Amino acid sequence: MFFELFKKECAQTGKSLIYWFYVLCLLLFFFTQMGNPGFDSQRKPVKGEEDTYGMVTSTDKDVIMEQTLGILGQNLYYDEWSTYPAGFVKYVSLSSREKEEIWNILGECTGLASEELREKIDTEMESDKQAEGYLDAYMQPLILEPSDTLSYDEFQEKMERICQILGPGSDFEKSSYEQGYPVPATYEEAMEEYNSFLYDDKITGGYARLFGDYMGIALGILPVFLVVTRELRDRRAGMEELIYTRTASSGKVVLSRWLSMNFMMILPVLLASFYTLFQCAAYARGLEVSVDYLAFMPVVLGWLLPEILIVSALGMFLTNLSSSPLAILVQGIWWFGDVFAGSNTGLATGDFGLHLVLRFNSTGGRQTFLDHFSQLTANRIFYFLLAMILLVLTVIVYREKRKGRWDFRGKIRSYRKRKSEA
């Protein structure tokens, strides 16, 4: 019975125009972002061409202090403060007293008097604006050297006070700044990164991460349109009452529909991953190195599939509960806020938190990714379990509507009909 329901639901999904709209949008996004990788991001370093070496993450204490203090000075200059509790952005407004206290802390860390410190920050920021433009100056980190007498322990104590002022989830938490900061790579470091890309990641590992990054953006919003349309289609076709009287249990009906839609939605993702895999294999043959032909499968099934599951589960629950396209609005707000927050925390830092859309926009950074892999795993398990909870709630709502309960729109229509007849 269940397998028959599953096959019928797959067939219905395949006949749906909105499904092919989903496939078209997904593949269009894929081809515009990764259709032609080019493989320029990982070229063999040439000695003497420092501009081509790229960046590496440094956890040197001096680098951590000067860049963290620079971020603090930059925030003071723009008077813009944001934190990321639970992975979501929160804008903080500070009082004049709190900002003055932060100025004093920064002065103690740099050993500069208040006026000298303010003048130094103003001069460097204005100079960057003139040289790079406002946006580039904003993105370019300010560097403030710590005082010669400032120890790392004292620096940490000062940052703890900053965290008390701003609240949880700021850039000044130990767990944040000790992840390190990007610095220009040396030739030796660039060669190490290149060899890791070829022989540890085997080329496909790096591009699988990039694939997950790009496809995750689209999959954070597109599935909800298919789910909502499929759920509302029966109401528009006047089939709701017939469906509610089926002999199959509510759990089987809901589960078969949910699984069939997720199965159909993951298929184009798999096809797109094969396309990139074959491109990587062709590139590897030219370099005479081997590739990992299974590198994309963990990304598709462990990174992207849980995202589809939670988006579809939320869409089914809200649509069954409200009998309206409310889920599109809710998912749209969540998706937009999450993508924006994820971009602000860095595109390849491994700071996954509780983000729906996981960002790691780099074919390199293998070690950084591995260092944060447990965080990614916890994130995807959390959303998988949340999807299961929403699925159970959907079954409950569906079952109650089968019994004629919770049909708020039907009751409203009946009330209006009785009122018009009176």
Residue spans for each PLM region:
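Hydrophobic alpha-helical transmembrane segments
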Residues: 20-23, 297-302, 328-331, 380-381
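Transport-system extracytoplasmic interface segments
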Residues: 104-208
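Terminal transmembrane helical anchor/hairpin motif
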Residues: 36-132, 192-199, 203, 326, ...
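Hydrophobic cores of alpha-helical transmembrane segments in multi-pass inner/ER membrane proteins
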Residues: 224, 306-313, 383-394
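Aromatic- and glycine-rich beta-strand/loop motifs that create alpha-glucan
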Residues: 1-26, 403-414
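Helix-loop-helix units of permease transmembrane domains in multi-pass membrane transporters
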Residues: 4-9, 14, 215, 228-267
